[in-house]
Amino acid sequence: IVIGARFSDRVTGNAQKFAQNAKIIQIDVDVAEMNKNVMISAGVVGDIKVVLDRLNERLEQQDHAEWVTKIQEYKEKYPLVYHKDVLSGPFVVEEIYRQTKGEAIISTEVGQHQMWAAQFYKYTKPRTFLTSGGLGTMGYGLGAALGAKSGREDKVVVNIAGDGCFRMNMNEIATAVRHNIPVIQVVINNHVLGMVRQWQNLFYGQRYSATVDFVKLAEAMGAEGIRATTQEEFKSAFEKAMNLGSPVVIDCQIDSDDKVWPMVAPGAAISEAFDEADLKNK
């Protein structure tokens, strides 16, 4: 059942191979979306709230225990893994989870850090993961974090960003300082925008963009700035940030070659996703 989605390639991969064995029912307010990217089995044109209210009148409560068990089996069979001995994006997110005991509100920007935040923080409550999904809105997360902290002063609020995304809206740290909104800004800093760096390598004589000193930047705006280059340094930095009661920027220096797994190659189907082990076995 597809509700208000447009079947973009970020969701379907190769649209011709998407959910070939499924019956697809699409609900959308715009008739032009029907059968546009994926052929559907049935379509319902209407306001989603009205349609879902009508559907709920006819549906019985479902027991999803069997499906939840199956998902758990998949997680055990295909666990998320990463290199445990160095500071990395997955480690940073898992450590945030450990120190906040899963009770924080997490916001993200767009990119690798966004995927790691979704994969390695165990969300158990609604409205605790604020992200723009596949919309690609770099700069969204810090503003979302300020709003969340203003509305829920009792919660630890962390914006997880990459160095590129943070630069899109980093001036809002000054807003946090001015209004004393104690958000924790974690920058997973791999020093690159992957696609931009590729163009710089191929077409601009390897003249790469410079990386900003985020610690000095935070201090210039009146916030605490902390740099972490090891796991122990990040543990200490985040513990300090939680106890400080004022805006903090933690600059986490990670390897530029760290990748998110699994992934789907351009033009491939979702069923053709691969990970690092698959590459090594080729």
Model-assigned labels for residue ranges:
Residues 2-70:
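Glycine-rich, acidic loop regions that bind phosphate or pyrophosphate groups
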Residues 3-8, 115-193:
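Thiamine diphosphate
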Residues 10-11, 239-282:
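Glycine/aspartate-rich loop-and-adjacent alpha/beta segment that forms the canonical ThDP
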Residues 34-42, 127-131, 168, 196-207, ...:
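Short beta-alpha connecting loops at secondary-structure transitions
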Residues 40-52, 171-188, 263-265:
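A short alpha/beta connector and helix-capping loop motif
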Residues 51, 200-239:
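Conserved thiamine diphosphate
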Residues 72-149:
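Active-site diphosphate/adenylate-binding microenvironment
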